[in-house]
């Protein structure tokens, strides 16, 4: 019998074992679609970003105008920009749901896959931050100023570090130039780390909703999950295109329609919606260094999750107490997101502090405690 090129060709056999003949659990639900959705988000962002970069000028006197020019004079430039800006929002929606899925079903017990995933999240956050600065509107400029300034809270080296990052004594042309360079580079780094993420995942195979070993009941990825993923792509692109066509500025800040002006501070400096939860945690501590540490901890805490798993069951499917806690955490994050968008005044300050405290309490104390309690109740 002639050898199948799909299985014998040095390159094709890698693709085959990753995307075609990959043995997959037969019972994975739609929550397992977000990995491929993140992949398609990344590809979309790189393609639209590349097209935008062809018309963008990384100079403080020209950046704002070059973006306006892209939207007004370039064929479908408005669409490319709207897809890129709103594509970032969908990227974050997908990654947050993907992390939530991993948390709920105990996928974090694949430690290498989980840790590379957290690194991917951090890189994505860095990419989105530097990208938001590029249009050089008011919120771009002041967002860059406020967030980079946080590094000055680091003892001893802080101020030097910030001036080194800025390339001067304030956010200016050198800052914009390097942010553009970083925004161009980081997505390719994300693509590289994604391959590592997938390599680690394919070492163990996918987890499943029951959290049990599924070797005895695997099915090929293609056609079952390739088709299911294609449906997922369609279901994501429909709202993305709807947003890009009908309400492209819904998630943006009106302040960014004003060119950057170092002499005028906007009344409310706030990041894009996907960073608001972390911004609320940052603001909840009335001390610069403390706030920066809490901000870092709010994301880095994900590295600790595998060590805080005390339950004898992997998934939360059959753990009602942990489920209640999980949805409390989700509600808590929504409250933090809302607080991050509000001005720093009563009652938002105290609500933010309570939500920030309960965020860390739920993750560090209650989850392991409830996991241990459920063991006592069940076994």
From Swiss-Prot:
Note: Heme 1 (or BL or b562) is low-potential and absorbs at about 562 nm, and heme 2 (or BH or b566) is high-potential and absorbs at about 566 nm.
Membrane-crossing residue ranges in chain numbering: 34-54, 78-99, 114-134, 179-199, 227-247, 289-309, 321-341, 348-368
Organism: Rhea americana
Name of the gene encoding the protein in the UniProt record: MT-CYB
Protein name stated in the entry: Cytochrome b
Bilayer disposition of the protein: Multi-pass membrane protein
Cofactor binding, note field: Binds 2 heme b groups non-covalently.
One cellular component term from this protein's GO annotations in UniProt: mitochondrial inner membrane
Function: Component of the ubiquinol-cytochrome c reductase complex (complex III or cytochrome b-c1 complex) that is part of the mitochondrial respiratory chain. The b-c1 complex mediates electron transfer from ubiquinol to cytochrome c. Contributes to the generation of a proton gradient across the mitochondrial membrane that is then used for ATP synthesis.
Cofactors: heme b
Top-level taxonomic group: Eukaryota
């Amino acid at each position: 019998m002639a050898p199948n090129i799909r299985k014998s060709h040095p390159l094709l056999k890698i693709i085959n074992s990753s995307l075609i003949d990959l043995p997959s659990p037969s019972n994975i639900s739609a929550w397992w679609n977000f990995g491929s959705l993140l992949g398609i988000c990344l590809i979309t962002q790189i393609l639209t970003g590349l097209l935008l970069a062809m018309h963008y000028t990384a100079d403080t006197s020209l950046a704002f105008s070059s973006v306006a020019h892209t939207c007004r004079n370039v064929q479908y430039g408005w669409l490319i920009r709207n897809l890129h800006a709103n594509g970032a929002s969908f990227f974050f929606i997908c990654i947050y749901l993907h992390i939530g899925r991993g948390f709920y079903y105990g996928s974090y017990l694949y430690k290498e896959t989980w840790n590379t995933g957290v690194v991917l999240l951090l890189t994505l956050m860095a990419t989105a931050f530097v990208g938001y600065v590029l249009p050089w509107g008011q919120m771009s400029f002041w967002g860059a100023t406020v967030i980079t300034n946080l590094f000055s809270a680091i003892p001893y080296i802080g101020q030097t570090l910030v001036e080194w990052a800025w390339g001067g004594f304030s956010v200016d042309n050198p800052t914009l130039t390097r942010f553009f360079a970083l925004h161009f580079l980081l997505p390719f780094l994300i693509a590289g780390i994604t391959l590592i993420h997938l390599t680690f995942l394919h070492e163990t195979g996918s987890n499943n909703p029951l959290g049990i070993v599924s070797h005895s009941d695997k099915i090929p990825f293609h056609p079952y999950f390739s088709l299911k993923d294609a449906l997922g792509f369609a279901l994501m692109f429909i709202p993305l295109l709807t947003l890009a066509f009908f309400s492209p500025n819904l998630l943006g800040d009106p302040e960014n329609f004003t060119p950057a002006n170092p002499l005028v501070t906007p009344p409310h400096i706030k990041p894009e919606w996907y960073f608001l939860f972390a911004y609320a945690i940052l603001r909840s501590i009335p001390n610069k260094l403390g706030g920066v540490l809490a901000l870092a901890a709010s994301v880095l805490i994900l590295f600790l999750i595998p060590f805080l798993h005390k339950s004898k069951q992997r998934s939360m499917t059959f753990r009602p107490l942990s489920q209640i806690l999980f949805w409390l955490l989700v509600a808590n994050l929504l409250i933090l997101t809302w607080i991050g968008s509000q001005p720093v005044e009563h009652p938002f300050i105290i609500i933010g502090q309570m939500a920030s405290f309960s965020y860390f309490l739920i993750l560090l104390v209650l989850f392991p405690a409830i996991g241990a309690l459920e063991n006592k109740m069940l076994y």
